[in-house]
Amino acid sequence: MAIIISVTNFEKEVMQSKIPVLVDFWAEWCGPCRMLTPVIDELAKEYAGKVKVCKLNVDELSDVASRFGVMSIPTVIVFKEGKVVNQVVGAVPKEKLAGIIDDLLAE
């Protein structure tokens, strides 16, 4: 299960993480975001312990979304050591996100 990001845990869960973090920026009203939800949940299970998978509701944390330039949702941003290393906009196939994670883990 993906970690739900809040104003109180963003720094700890994402910016200070010792392992890479995939963050799904989404909203309840966003149809493509809902399509991506099962993909995000599968990635969380498959990469447990290797990559942290998180969900951030842009309606609740619009300041964080703005901080990272999120203009469209869903947007998936991958962080490593507190820095953005990849970003994908739109409801993309699981294989694309898995490929990004695999490439990152191979570094």
Question: What do these predicted ranges mean?
Answer:
Residues 1-52, 60-107:
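Proteins that catalyze or organize thiol-disulfide redox chemistry
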Residues 55:
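Conserved residues in the N-terminal Rossmann fold of short-chain dehydrogenase/reductase
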